[in-house]
């Protein structure tokens, strides 16, 4: 996404900061390029956790993607976005029975079971509903695949079932009467910028499907290759060779379809790669101050809206890329200075930029955080200190659409019961 400073400045005259601005044309072009490079036998599924705005999800539905959800709430959001049940998969290591019941009742394409106990819960619920539930099993592979920002497989994790347990898992699968086994899922990590490790993991997943056929005589109807495609947030990071990934994985999938899996659906999940670079988070400078020889610039947005870009939970890290828009009438040439850019919250973790070199910033100027389309608002502690949720704006085909209103105090208290009549019991 290219930042147009005049456009951003004009929007701040109509909409109160902070806000997110998404470039819908960029999102579409980015996805269609990925789609055009990839074997048609591979379907893409949007990971809703990366951004749960239903207006963005609707665009991906219109472009033919399925959706991956990880809670009953995300399942409801997916249905509100218009996704049909047969285009929804449900993952997550800790699904409650009530959530599994909703998934079974909804008839979604696939529940990704992450333990043998979960398989039996699904079977019990399917029998109760007199329905056939469709499941895939998530496998934690015996092998680890190179470096990735957050490892989710190939090491001890709460996700999935160890590959070494496959005999016991398949014994459980064979015992199911109301639950249909349709395939496997492997997801080894997120924010992965290692091209070769992604390729290796996806090829390994295809081979696991072959092994299941050879050992157990079961053909996988669905092989979920995972995803985890990363984007370079910081100057020291290099972009994936996405052409190499799509070309190599497409060829490997085609070979598998030609030899063993002619009817199998292959899936790649993506959220960050599809959305991260398509948005900017716009904040306004409220104050500038000095403390013990350092300059602090206080802006009106921060950790409560965009936790991933702040210092929350990290002692050492890099700053997200930012651009600065001088708005004051006297904003001529300004000298560079080293500052810390902090948000409005009562915690030192609410820091958008530490020791950044910027043109001198004053109240009314704008600080824009780039690469903010994924794991922004959906990943943030929005209730902390009671600030309103930010506006979200979608730009598409030269028009602007408000896709999330500014939050209110009523939103904060909406789920909090207000009367004494809510007393449930007295513990004596």
UniProtKB/Swiss-Prot annotation:
It catalyses: gamma-L-glutamyl-[BtrI ACP] + H(+) = 4-aminobutanoyl-[BtrI ACP] + CO2. The gene is btrK. Its cofactor is pyridoxal 5'-phosphate. Homodimer. This is L-glutamyl-[BtrI acyl-carrier protein] decarboxylase. One of its GO terms (molecular function) is carboxy-lyase activity. Pyridoxal phosphate-dependent decarboxylase that catalyzes 1 step in the biosynthesis of the side chain of the aminoglycoside antibiotics in the biosynthetic pathway of butirosin. Able to decarboxylate L-ornithine, L-arginine, L-lysine, but not L-glutamate or any D-amino acids. Has low activity with substrates not bound to an acyl-carrier protein. Belongs to the Orn/Lys/Arg decarboxylase class-II family.
